[in-house]
Regions:
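Hydrophobic alpha-helical segments at protein termini of multi-pass membrane proteins
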Residues: 2-380
Length: 380
């Protein structure tokens, strides 16, 4: 064999060994990534299972968002929309045995969002293009209303029991929203903020969590009233009732913030509207929904009483809402970004909401079993 052939074989062997090492390294890296993914999934499952257990559900959160929102992009008829809107009356509330325990596929909320967005754009054209200042109040109100009300319709559609009418939701939204603001204003008279806030208007960490505690308590008082009034023991109802009050609170608060910032801070109106709009998806709407579910979980079959505030289940969910609210209001950032902080808080709060929704659907199954047992006893 010539020296050239020997050299060629050596080069080939070295090349093959290099490829083998690269493949081994890639396989090792893939295995590590798979292990990390499995560990993260296991951690998520254990965490959601532990939280869900407080609400009566021993299963981990297993939700396919793509499937859940699959109806959003499909065409729907007016009759389909009407069927959703007429839910909750004596004639349209389904029997417990006819309720599905599967995850719902809401879609009407997206049409509500589109309708309000079109309205907002038309008002903006009136104000910006035609210099019509009469459109500005409408621009502020619709800007504040669009996301909270669309989100509220999501909770309305997700109420598998379909036992709360749109009329009751509107009452809770307007009356509950205003009175939750009023109760919050009363509670603020009994708290003292730091000198830093009093002098410069900036919140310390303690101030921020105090704001969360006061506002979630103010809303909780009104949520308790409506939960007891409707005499419900269903978690999905608690989510809807809480979301109704929270959405109303958010709309009136945001409208005030938009007006004050636009007039007093020299900030462009649209900037404030868009900021309040996209952040509303993770604010009062969902914090109050969690509190509403917590109230229902703690009270069980009777009305909510003062002693129920010491129930471990209520305290954990209520303080979770307070904590998320407090962190939201702090000057804390993640990697120097306040937007990233808000985004992470939105993800966390919706995970909690979906855990509670899962517990609510599990409750459907339990109530159906209770109903069947009662029917069997009657027949015996």
């Amino acid at each position: 064999m010539s020296s050239a052939s020997i050299q060629s074989n050596k080069t080939s062997n070295i090349h093959n060994e290099s490829i083998d090492k690269q493949m081994e390294a890639k396989a090792h890296e893939t295995a590590q990534n798979t292990d990390l993914k499995n560990e993260a999934r296991s951690l998520f499952d254990n965490a959601t299972k532990s939280i869900g257990r407080l609400a009566g559900n021993d299963e981990s959160l297993n939700l396919n968002l793509k499937d859940m929102f699959s109806e959003v992009f499909k065409p729907h008829t007016k009759n389909e929309a009407d069927e959703i809107f007429i839910a909750g009356t004596a004639k349209t509330t389904p029997a417990i045995c006819d309720i599905s325990e599967e995850w719902g596929k809401p879609w009407l909320f997206s049409r509500v969002f589109i309708a309000f967005t079109v309205t907002f754009i038309a008002l903006w054209v009136m104000a910006a293009v035609f210099n019509n200042t009469n459109a500005i109040p409408g621009l502020i109100f619709i800007g504040a209303l669009t996301v909270p009300l669309s989100g509220l319709f999501f909770f309305y559609e997700s109420n598998a029991f379909k036992n709360i009418s749109i009329f009751e939701v509107i009452i809770m939204f307007f009356i509950g929203g205003v009175f939750s603001l009023l109760s919050t204003m009363v509670l603020y008279r009994f708290v003292v903020f730091s000198d830093q806030f009093e002098r410069f208007g900036s919140l310390t960490f303690f101030d921020a969590f105090l704001v969360g505690l006061v506002e979630e308590t103010g809303k909780a008082l009104i949520i308790v009233y409506f939960v007891n009034k409707l005499k419900t023991n269903k978690i999905l109802n608690g989510l809807l009732i809480g979301a109704s009050i929270g959405a109303g609170f958010a709309v009136f608060e945001s409208a005030g913030y938009i007006l004050n910032f636009a007039l007093g801070e020299n900030v462009p109106l649209l900037d404030i509207v868009f900021t309040r709009a996209w952040t509303a998806i993770g604010g009062h709407l969902v914090w109050s929904a969690i509190v509403g579910a917590a109230i229902v979980i703690a009270k069980e079959q009777r009305g909510f009483e003062f002693k129920d505030i010491f129930d471990k289940r209520f305290l954990i969910f209520f303080l979770s809402a307070v904590g998320l609210h407090g962190i939201w209001d702090t000057s804390l950032t993640i990697l120097g970004s306040d937007t990233l902080k808000i985004f992470i808080l939105i993800v966390v709060v919706w995970i909690l909401v979906f855990i509670l929704m899962g517990a609510g659907l599990k409750q459907v199954n339990l109530l159906q079993k209770e109903f069947k047992d009662q029917q069997n006893k009657i027949q015996e």
